[in-house]
A protein has these predicted regions:
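As written
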Residues: 131-132
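Active-site pocket-lining/capping segments in soluble small-molecule metabolic enzymes
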Residues: 1-116, 136-137, 143-300
Length: 300
Protein backbone atom coordinates (compact mmCIF):
# COMPACT_ATOMS: atom_id res chain seq x y z
CA UNK A 1 0.00 0.00 0.00
CA UNK A 2 1.06 3.58 -0.63
CA UNK A 3 -0.36 7.05 -0.14
CA UNK A 4 0.13 10.19 -2.23
CA UNK A 5 0.09 13.66 -0.67
CA UNK A 6 0.34 17.20 -2.02
CA UNK A 7 -0.26 20.77 -0.87
CA UNK A 8 -3.31 22.68 -2.08
CA UNK A 9 -3.75 26.29 -3.16
CA UNK A 10 -7.45 26.62 -2.34
CA UNK A 11 -10.28 24.50 -1.01
CA UNK A 12 -11.57 23.98 -4.54
CA UNK A 13 -8.49 21.79 -5.15
CA UNK A 14 -9.77 19.08 -2.81
CA UNK A 15 -12.25 17.47 -5.21
CA UNK A 16 -9.69 17.73 -8.01
CA UNK A 17 -7.05 16.03 -5.87
CA UNK A 18 -9.51 13.35 -4.81
CA UNK A 19 -10.28 12.51 -8.42
CA UNK A 20 -6.52 12.36 -9.15
CA UNK A 21 -5.93 9.74 -6.46
CA UNK A 22 -4.27 11.95 -3.84
CA UNK A 23 -4.88 10.64 -0.32
CA UNK A 24 -3.66 13.51 1.89
CA UNK A 25 -3.93 17.26 1.28
CA UNK A 26 -1.48 19.63 2.98
CA UNK A 27 -2.54 23.07 4.22
CA UNK A 28 -0.27 25.97 5.12
CA UNK A 29 -0.89 28.76 7.62
CA UNK A 30 0.41 32.32 7.78
CA UNK A 31 3.31 32.66 10.25
CA UNK A 32 3.56 28.92 10.93
CA UNK A 33 4.39 27.44 7.51
CA UNK A 34 7.61 27.72 5.53
CA UNK A 35 7.48 27.89 1.73
CA UNK A 36 3.70 27.49 1.40
CA UNK A 37 1.92 26.69 -1.85
CA UNK A 38 -1.38 28.21 -0.73
CA UNK A 39 -2.11 29.86 2.63
CA UNK A 40 -5.28 29.13 4.60
CA UNK A 41 -7.03 30.44 7.68
CA UNK A 42 -7.90 28.11 10.55
CA UNK A 43 -11.54 28.36 9.56
CA UNK A 44 -10.70 27.23 6.01
CA UNK A 45 -8.59 24.35 7.33
CA UNK A 46 -11.48 23.21 9.53
CA UNK A 47 -13.82 23.36 6.55
CA UNK A 48 -11.30 21.57 4.36
CA UNK A 49 -10.72 18.84 6.94
CA UNK A 50 -14.45 18.10 7.14
CA UNK A 51 -14.67 17.88 3.35
CA UNK A 52 -11.61 15.63 3.16
CA UNK A 53 -13.03 13.26 5.76
CA UNK A 54 -16.30 13.07 3.83
CA UNK A 55 -14.22 11.97 0.82
CA UNK A 56 -12.26 9.45 2.93
CA UNK A 57 -9.11 11.57 2.60
CA UNK A 58 -6.74 13.01 5.20
CA UNK A 59 -5.76 16.56 6.13
CA UNK A 60 -2.26 17.68 7.07
CA UNK A 61 -1.03 21.06 8.29
CA UNK A 62 2.50 22.43 7.97
CA UNK A 63 3.92 23.85 11.22
CA UNK A 64 7.36 24.07 9.65
CA UNK A 65 8.91 27.26 10.97
CA UNK A 66 11.56 27.42 13.69
CA UNK A 67 10.10 28.89 16.87
CA UNK A 68 11.85 31.33 19.18
CA UNK A 69 11.04 31.21 22.89
CA UNK A 70 8.49 34.01 22.61
CA UNK A 71 6.69 32.17 19.78
CA UNK A 72 6.19 28.81 21.49
CA UNK A 73 2.95 29.85 23.18
CA UNK A 74 1.45 30.67 19.77
CA UNK A 75 2.56 27.23 18.59
CA UNK A 76 0.85 25.57 21.56
CA UNK A 77 -2.37 27.50 20.87
CA UNK A 78 -2.30 26.46 17.21
CA UNK A 79 -1.74 22.82 18.10
CA UNK A 80 -4.77 22.92 20.38
CA UNK A 81 -6.87 24.37 17.55
CA UNK A 82 -5.68 21.72 15.10
CA UNK A 83 -6.46 18.97 17.60
CA UNK A 84 -9.97 20.34 18.06
CA UNK A 85 -10.41 20.42 14.26
CA UNK A 86 -9.47 16.72 14.07
CA UNK A 87 -6.64 17.39 11.62
CA UNK A 88 -5.01 14.05 10.79
CA UNK A 89 -1.34 14.98 10.42
CA UNK A 90 0.97 17.87 11.35
CA UNK A 91 4.35 18.38 9.71
CA UNK A 92 7.02 19.90 11.94
CA UNK A 93 10.67 20.91 11.69
CA UNK A 94 11.39 22.33 15.15
CA UNK A 95 11.43 19.76 17.97
CA UNK A 96 9.68 22.29 20.20
CA UNK A 97 6.55 21.17 18.34
CA UNK A 98 7.21 17.60 19.45
CA UNK A 99 7.48 18.61 23.10
CA UNK A 100 4.35 20.77 22.96
CA UNK A 101 2.39 18.07 21.15
CA UNK A 102 3.46 15.56 23.79
CA UNK A 103 2.05 17.82 26.50
CA UNK A 104 -1.21 18.01 24.54
CA UNK A 105 -1.37 14.22 23.95
CA UNK A 106 -1.25 14.53 20.16
CA UNK A 107 2.20 13.23 19.19
CA UNK A 108 0.61 10.55 17.04
CA UNK A 109 -0.39 13.23 14.51
CA UNK A 110 3.17 14.47 13.91
CA UNK A 111 5.42 13.96 10.89
CA UNK A 112 9.02 15.08 11.37
CA UNK A 113 10.22 16.86 8.23
CA UNK A 114 13.60 18.53 8.86
CA UNK A 115 14.51 18.72 5.14
CA UNK A 116 18.06 17.37 5.12
CA UNK A 117 18.60 15.78 8.53
CA UNK A 118 17.13 12.26 8.33
CA UNK A 119 19.94 10.45 6.53
CA UNK A 120 20.12 7.08 8.28
CA UNK A 121 17.99 4.44 9.98
CA UNK A 122 19.05 5.42 13.49
CA UNK A 123 17.86 9.00 12.92
CA UNK A 124 14.50 7.84 11.60
CA UNK A 125 13.92 5.19 14.26
CA UNK A 126 14.78 7.58 17.09
CA UNK A 127 12.00 9.99 16.14
CA UNK A 128 9.50 7.25 15.32
CA UNK A 129 10.17 5.75 18.75
CA UNK A 130 8.97 9.03 20.28
CA UNK A 131 5.48 7.99 19.19
CA UNK A 132 5.04 10.25 16.17
CA UNK A 133 3.16 9.28 13.00
CA UNK A 134 6.02 9.46 10.53
CA UNK A 135 9.39 10.79 9.40
CA UNK A 136 10.40 12.36 6.08
CA UNK A 137 13.70 11.11 4.71
CA UNK A 138 16.28 13.60 3.48
CA UNK A 139 15.78 14.49 -0.17
CA UNK A 140 19.56 14.59 -0.65
CA UNK A 141 20.20 10.87 -0.17
CA UNK A 142 20.22 8.23 -2.90
CA UNK A 143 17.53 5.70 -3.74
CA UNK A 144 19.83 2.92 -2.54
CA UNK A 145 20.23 4.67 0.82
CA UNK A 146 16.46 5.16 1.14
CA UNK A 147 15.86 1.46 0.49
CA UNK A 148 18.55 0.50 3.00
CA UNK A 149 16.97 2.74 5.65
CA UNK A 150 13.48 1.36 4.97
CA UNK A 151 14.75 -2.20 5.48
CA UNK A 152 15.87 -1.35 9.01
CA UNK A 153 13.16 0.99 10.27
CA UNK A 154 9.87 0.07 11.92
CA UNK A 155 7.37 2.83 11.25
CA UNK A 156 6.07 5.18 8.58
CA UNK A 157 8.63 6.76 6.25
CA UNK A 158 7.86 9.48 3.73
CA UNK A 159 9.82 10.46 0.62
CA UNK A 160 9.48 13.55 -1.56
CA UNK A 161 9.13 12.15 -5.07
CA UNK A 162 8.41 15.11 -7.34
CA UNK A 163 9.01 18.85 -7.61
CA UNK A 164 11.57 21.54 -6.92
CA UNK A 165 13.65 20.90 -3.80
CA UNK A 166 14.44 23.57 -1.25
CA UNK A 167 18.23 23.85 -1.02
CA UNK A 168 18.83 26.99 1.07
CA UNK A 169 16.94 29.06 3.63
CA UNK A 170 18.04 32.30 5.26
CA UNK A 171 16.02 34.32 7.73
CA UNK A 172 17.45 37.41 6.04
CA UNK A 173 15.34 39.11 3.38
CA UNK A 174 18.03 38.84 0.74
CA UNK A 175 15.89 39.88 -2.23
CA UNK A 176 14.68 42.99 -0.42
CA UNK A 177 18.27 43.90 0.41
CA UNK A 178 19.32 43.30 -3.19
CA UNK A 179 16.66 45.58 -4.65
CA UNK A 180 17.33 48.22 -2.00
CA UNK A 181 21.00 48.12 -3.01
CA UNK A 182 19.96 48.65 -6.63
CA UNK A 183 17.67 51.49 -5.59
CA UNK A 184 14.68 49.78 -7.18
CA UNK A 185 11.23 48.92 -5.91
CA UNK A 186 9.95 45.44 -6.68
CA UNK A 187 6.90 43.48 -5.55
CA UNK A 188 8.27 40.34 -3.91
CA UNK A 189 5.10 39.10 -2.22
CA UNK A 190 4.07 35.73 -3.68
CA UNK A 191 6.46 36.30 -6.59
CA UNK A 192 7.53 32.91 -7.93
CA UNK A 193 9.07 34.18 -11.18
CA UNK A 194 12.56 35.07 -9.93
CA UNK A 195 15.57 32.79 -10.24
CA UNK A 196 19.31 32.67 -9.75
CA UNK A 197 21.90 31.48 -12.27
CA UNK A 198 25.45 30.45 -11.52
CA UNK A 199 28.08 31.79 -13.89
CA UNK A 200 29.18 28.35 -15.06
CA UNK A 201 25.79 26.59 -15.10
CA UNK A 202 22.69 26.76 -17.26
CA UNK A 203 20.23 25.92 -14.48
CA UNK A 204 17.61 28.38 -13.24
CA UNK A 205 17.27 28.14 -9.45
CA UNK A 206 13.95 29.64 -8.25
CA UNK A 207 14.25 32.07 -5.35
CA UNK A 208 11.39 33.40 -3.23
CA UNK A 209 11.04 35.64 -0.21
CA UNK A 210 8.32 35.36 2.43
CA UNK A 211 7.81 36.35 6.05
CA UNK A 212 10.25 33.62 7.13
CA UNK A 213 13.07 34.91 4.92
CA UNK A 214 14.62 33.82 1.63
CA UNK A 215 14.42 30.37 0.03
CA UNK A 216 16.42 29.01 -2.92
CA UNK A 217 15.40 25.87 -4.81
CA UNK A 218 17.17 23.39 -7.05
CA UNK A 219 17.74 24.13 -10.70
CA UNK A 220 16.05 20.82 -11.53
CA UNK A 221 12.62 19.33 -10.98
CA UNK A 222 12.81 15.97 -9.23
CA UNK A 223 10.92 13.27 -11.12
CA UNK A 224 10.84 9.75 -9.66
CA UNK A 225 8.55 7.78 -11.96
CA UNK A 226 11.19 5.14 -12.55
CA UNK A 227 12.05 4.82 -8.84
CA UNK A 228 8.73 4.84 -6.97
CA UNK A 229 7.93 1.15 -7.35
CA UNK A 230 11.27 0.19 -5.82
CA UNK A 231 10.68 2.61 -2.94
CA UNK A 232 7.22 1.22 -2.22
CA UNK A 233 8.45 -2.38 -2.44
CA UNK A 234 11.11 -1.47 0.13
CA UNK A 235 8.40 -0.38 2.57
CA UNK A 236 8.17 3.38 1.99
CA UNK A 237 4.44 4.03 1.93
CA UNK A 238 4.10 7.82 1.97
CA UNK A 239 4.97 9.67 -1.24
CA UNK A 240 4.74 13.46 -1.45
CA UNK A 241 4.55 15.81 -4.43
CA UNK A 242 5.96 19.31 -3.87
CA UNK A 243 3.23 21.60 -5.21
CA UNK A 244 5.23 24.83 -5.18
CA UNK A 245 5.93 26.14 -8.71
CA UNK A 246 3.18 23.88 -10.08
CA UNK A 247 -0.46 24.71 -10.74
CA UNK A 248 -3.10 22.62 -8.99
CA UNK A 249 -3.99 21.10 -12.38
CA UNK A 250 -0.36 20.07 -12.86
CA UNK A 251 -0.26 18.59 -9.36
CA UNK A 252 -3.39 16.57 -10.06
CA UNK A 253 -2.11 15.27 -13.39
CA UNK A 254 1.25 14.38 -11.86
CA UNK A 255 -0.52 12.42 -9.11
CA UNK A 256 -2.57 10.55 -11.71
CA UNK A 257 0.60 9.64 -13.59
CA UNK A 258 2.35 8.38 -10.44
CA UNK A 259 -0.68 6.30 -9.50
CA UNK A 260 -0.76 4.84 -13.02
CA UNK A 261 2.91 3.89 -12.71
CA UNK A 262 2.49 2.45 -9.22
CA UNK A 263 -0.58 0.45 -10.22
CA UNK A 264 1.09 -0.93 -13.35
CA UNK A 265 -0.83 0.93 -16.04
CA UNK A 266 2.15 2.95 -17.27
CA UNK A 267 5.91 2.49 -17.50
CA UNK A 268 7.98 4.60 -15.11
CA UNK A 269 10.78 5.09 -17.63
CA UNK A 270 8.40 6.05 -20.42
CA UNK A 271 6.62 8.50 -18.11
CA UNK A 272 9.94 10.08 -17.09
CA UNK A 273 10.90 10.55 -20.73
CA UNK A 274 7.46 11.96 -21.52
CA UNK A 275 7.85 14.59 -18.78
CA UNK A 276 11.28 15.55 -20.13
CA UNK A 277 9.62 16.29 -23.47
CA UNK A 278 6.52 17.90 -22.00
CA UNK A 279 8.44 20.23 -19.64
CA UNK A 280 11.68 21.10 -21.49
CA UNK A 281 12.31 24.21 -19.36
CA UNK A 282 12.02 22.46 -16.00
CA UNK A 283 15.19 20.36 -16.22
CA UNK A 284 13.37 17.13 -15.31
CA UNK A 285 15.82 15.01 -13.33
CA UNK A 286 16.22 12.10 -10.93
CA UNK A 287 17.94 14.56 -8.59
CA UNK A 288 20.10 12.81 -6.01
CA UNK A 289 18.56 9.36 -6.53
CA UNK A 290 21.79 8.08 -8.07
CA UNK A 291 24.25 10.84 -7.19
CA UNK A 292 25.61 11.47 -3.72
CA UNK A 293 25.70 15.13 -2.69
CA UNK A 294 29.26 14.57 -1.50
CA UNK A 295 30.43 13.86 -5.05
CA UNK A 296 33.18 16.29 -6.02
CA UNK A 297 33.39 17.51 -9.60
CA UNK A 298 36.92 17.30 -10.96
CA UNK A 299 37.95 19.43 -13.91
CA UNK A 300 39.67 17.32 -16.53
Amino acid sequence: MFELSAASYELADIKKYHDAGINTVLFALPFFSARPAGVFTNQQIEEGTKLLHELNMKSAVQLTRFFTESECEACRDELQLLKAMNVDQIYFTDCAVLQLADELAMKDKLIYNPDTLITNAADAQFYLDQGIHGVTLSKEITKEEMIDIAAQVKGNLEVLIHGRLNMMHSKRRLLTSYYEFLGREFDLENNHDLYLMEENRDEHMPIIEDELGTHVFTGFTLCSFNEVNDLVKAGIQSLRIESLFMSSDEVAQTARDYRDVLEGRKSGLEMFEAYQKQYPNQNISTGFMYKKTSTVKVNV
